[in-house]
Every structure is written in structure tokens, then in C-alpha cells.
């Protein structure tokens, strides 16, 4: 089976976005109607056609074109969701790419929140779906202890974190798609481990930080 070739009409693609006649304009509630949205929508058509003509076989691509079924996120030539190690980000800092801006390991709760925002926002540009960190309260609790933070200070940092994660900074004027999960109590495999903060091993363990974890969870 040989698939027919489909060419994307550049003029029609732009005009369909501008007058909102293309269903894709409203397909994603997180995507704003904007110049970035126009660029993403136009490029997405090209990528979707690449999938259908050069990745999927005609037996798979043709039924999609004919409406027998729908292949989701064809405009994203990327993996879907990814989970990352918050522990590693805290220990190493946001770096590792030559020629790009880099940061040393965070030493404070606020700077750790900033690196989380930048990490998730940057990695989001390489994936179609959510970017996730697990054990947020466990790994962030040492900063609360070291910074001797009060509840109101934690609330302020969490407000900034949540707000900044929802700024439409992703391509197409979207906000990053992010997930944070919380342990509520320290996992057994971390209870006796001493955190590494700012390249220094602290004199307490994760298991001794239940009070600090409670403050983080309450603030969130």
C-alpha cells in the first residue's frame, strides 16, 4: 500500500489560524491565540504530516486521515511524559549543557524553587506531556530547616512557585504541563540518609524533618 503525498498549504494554514477556522486553534485550552500559537500551529501541521508519511505505515496513516480513528498529538515529534530526580537537581544544580547558562546547587528554599521552575520549563520544550518531580516535600524539607523558615515564608515561596509554573512560557503561549507529588511522611529508604545541600552533607537526616514536611504540605 502506497500512501498519497500531502502537501501543506502555507497560505491556507496561516489564514485558517488567523480566522480560527482550523479546529486545532481551540484543541488545547492551555494554548493562547497568539503569534506563538500561530507558529506552533503551522509547524505542527508539518510535523503531523511527517509522522503520517514517514513514520507510520500507510495502513496506520490512511485511517487517521479518513477519520476512522484519531492519533493524538501528531504535531509533537517527541516523547509524552517524563519524571525527573528532584534529589539530583538539588545536589547538582541546573546545568550540564555546554554553552548554556548553568547554576550551582541551590542553598536556600527560594533558590531551589527557582531552579525547579527553570528545569521543568526548559525540559517541557523537549516533551509533549507532563514533566514531574516526586517526593517534593521530602527533598525540600532540608531547606526549611537550614533557612529556619516560618510558615508564612514557606507560603510565599510556594505561591511564587505555583504562579511561575503557570506562566505561559512554553512554545505556543502555553504554560508548562507539570506534576509535583508529595510523600506526606518520609519514605523508609530515605529516613536515615543525610541530605547533600550546597555541596555539603548536613548533620540531620530526612527522617528527622517531619515538622518541616508538614509545613510544606500545609503551605501547598
Predicted regions and their residues:
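Catalytic alpha/beta active-site cores
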Residues: 1-220
Amino acid at each position: 500500500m502506497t500512501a498519497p503525498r500531502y502537501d501543506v498549504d502555507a497560505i491556507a494554514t496561516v489564514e485558517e489560524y488567523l480566522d480560527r477556522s482550523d479546529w486545532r486553534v481551540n484543541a488545547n485550552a492551555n494554548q493562547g491565540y497568539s503569534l506563538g500559537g500561530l507558529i506552533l500551529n503551522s509547524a505542527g501541521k508539518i510535523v503531523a504530516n511527517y509522522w503520517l508519511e514517514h513514520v507510520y505505515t500507510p495502513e496506520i496513516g490512511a485511517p487517521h486521515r479518513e477519520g476512522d480513528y484519531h492519533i493524538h498529538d501528531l504535531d509533537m515529534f517527541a516523547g509524552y511524559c517524563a519524571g525527573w530526580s528532584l534529589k539530583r537537581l538539588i545536589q547538582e544544580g541546573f546545568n550540564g549543557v555546554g554553552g548554556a547558562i548553568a547554576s550551582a546547587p541551590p542553598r536556600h528554599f527560594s533558590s531551589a524553587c527557582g531552579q525547579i521552575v527553570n528545569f521543568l520549563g526548559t525540559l517541557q520544550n523537549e516533551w509533549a506531556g507532563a514533566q514531574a518531580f516526586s517526593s517534593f516535600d521530602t527533598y525540600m524539607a532540608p531547606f526549611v530547616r537550614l533557612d529556619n523558615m516560618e510558615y508564612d515564608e514557606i507560603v510565599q515561596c510556594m505561591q511564587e512557585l505555583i504562579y511561575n509554573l503557570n506562566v505561559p512560557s512554553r512554545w505556543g503561549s502555553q504554560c508548562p504541563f507539570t506534576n509535583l507529588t508529595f510523600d506526606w511522611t518520609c519514605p523508609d529508604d530515605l529516613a536515615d540518609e543525610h541530605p547533600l545541600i550546597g555541596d555539603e552533607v548536613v548533620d540531620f537526616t530526612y527522617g528527622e524533618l517531619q515538622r518541616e514536611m508538614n509545613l510544606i504540605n500545609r503551605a501547598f
